[in-house]
């Protein structure tokens, strides 16, 4: 096996949730550049169509699958439709996620429930639905998008931190249950990246100054810097890697 083949995704089909923008869209494009046939998932058809047009403008191809990852029945039906109409899902990037910020003592039940529904329940719903098809085939890659917030806490985002801690340990549980069937399930944990979700923090000079001093790399991450890790975890290069969470964080989790 040559070195390029080790990381090639040619012939593999990848479902990426929350793929209409941000990290999900960037990872989807990255997988496509390494040869994967990408299926973009989201709840909004117009947003997905726009994302698909962006693929075509860059000479890439993608299909779309509109369903709500927080609705288990919709997930089961959506995954089944992809398998039936497009072909087997070889790679799942469980990316869909949201953020809510407020002091913990003021945090609303609705915001708590929304976070749990999107950040935790959806990872289980989509992971389970896809794994049910992967297991009989004896192969498959699942990459759950985690966060450094599973290891670090900051004021105002305690519930988000709780959801990402849950995803980290759900990843380990998935690997324990499904590894025996030939699946590899791992996590990719971004540090502080400049995305739509972090626009307010990027614009906050005081926070950015603190972050750059706190991070050995001395800067915000750029979303394209997540692609290499995603390709590794999606490819044959990680065939004996299971239940791990790969931190892509510029070193912030190892620095005091």
From Swiss-Prot:
GO cellular component: cytoplasm
Location within or outside the cell: Cytoplasm
SUPFAM superfamilies for this protein: NAD(P)-binding Rossmann-fold domains
PROSITE patterns noted in UniProt: ADH_SHORT
Record GO terms (molecular function): gluconate 5-dehydrogenase activity; NADP binding; protein homodimerization activity
Active-site feature positions: 160
Listed SMART domains: PKS_KR
pH dependence: Optimum pH is 10.0 for gluconate oxidation. Optimum pH is 5.0 for 5-ketogluconate reduction.
Reactions catalysed according to its record: D-gluconate + NADP(+) = 5-dehydro-D-gluconate + NADPH + H(+)
Signal peptide range in chain numbering: none
EC number: 1.1.1.-
InterPro entries linked: NAD(P)-bd_dom_sf (IPR036291), Sc_DH/Rdtase_CS (IPR020904), SDR_fam (IPR002347)
Role summary: Catalyzes the reversible NADP-dependent oxidation of gluconate to 5-ketogluconate. Is involved in the non-phosphorylative, ketogenic oxidation of glucose. Is almost inactive with NAD as cosubstrate. Displays high substrate specificity since D-Glucose, D-sorbitol, and D-mannitol are not oxidized by the enzyme, and 2-ketogluconate and L-sorbose are not reduced. Can accept D-fructose as a substrate, with a rate that is only 10% of the rate of 5-ketogluconate reduction.
Subunit structure: Homodimer.
Homology family: Belongs to the short-chain dehydrogenases/reductases (SDR) family.
Name assigned to this protein: Gluconate 5-dehydrogenase
Organism lineage: Bacteria, Pseudomonadati, Pseudomonadota, Alphaproteobacteria, Acetobacterales
Gene: gno
